[in-house]
Design a protein with these regions (language model features):
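Solvent-exposed, polar/charged alpha-helical surfaces in well-ordered, non-transmembrane soluble domains
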Residues: 7, 11-15, 36-40, 70, ...
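Catalytic cysteine-centered active-site loop
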Residues: 19-71
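Aromatic- and glycine-rich peptidoglycan recognition patches
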Residues: 48, 63-64, 78, 84-85, ...
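Short beta-strand segments that buttress and anchor functional surface loops
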Residues: 73-79
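Intrinsically disordered, low-complexity
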Residues: 1-20, 126-127
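Solvent-exposed polar/charged
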Residues: 15, 43-44, 89
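Structural motif
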Residues: 72-73, 94
Length: 127
C-alpha cells in the first residue's frame, strides 16, 4: 500500500471505534467481527478486497518483522488455540484497532498489553 492508502486505512479504522461487535459481521449498520472489520476498512479506504477469516487473511498476506511494520499493516493473534485466529489493524506506536467481542465492540489496544502480547503471532502486509 502507498503511504496515502496506509493513512486512509488508519483513519477509517479509527472512525470504527466503539462500533458493535457481531460474530460474522461485515457491515457498518450491523457490526463487525475481527475479519469483517479489516475487510470493511480495507475496501472502503484502500479499495482492497480482503475477505474471509483471519486465518484466510494471513494466507493472503506476507509476514514481516516488527521493525518493518507500518501503520495500516495487519497484526495477528492466536486467541482460540489456533494460529492467526484473530486479526487487527496496526495503527503505529505499538497500538492496533480490532473488533474485540460483544461486550467491548471495536476498540484500540496496546500490543504490550499482557493478554495480547502472550497471543501475538506477528505482523503481515499486503503483497
Amino acid at each position: 500500500l502507498s503511504q496515502d492508502k496506509r493513512q486512509d486505512v488508519v483513519i477509517q479504522s479509527m472512525a470504527m471505534l466503539d462500533r458493535n461487535y457481531t460474530y460474522g459481521g461485515k457491515k457498518l449498520h450491523t457490526g463487525f467481527d475481527c475479519s469483517g472489520l479489516v475487510s470493511f476498512v480495507y475496501k472502503q479506504s484502500a479499495g482492497v478486497n480482503l475477505q474471509g477469516s483471519a486465518a484466510d487473511m494471513a494466507k493472503r498476506t506476507q509476514a514481516i518483522d516488527a521493525q518493518s511494520a507500518q501503520p495500516g499493516d495487519l497484526v495477528f493473534f492466536n486467541t482460540l488455540g489456533t494460529p492467526n485466529s484473530h486479526v487487527g489493524i496496526y495503527i503505529g506506536s505499538g497500538k492496533f484497532i480490532h473488533a474485540a467481542n460483544e461486550r467491548t465492540g471495536v476498540r484500540q489496544e496496546r500490543l504490550d498489553n499482557s493478554y495480547w502480547s502472550k497471543r501475538f503471532e506477528g505482523f503481515r502486509t499486503l503483497n
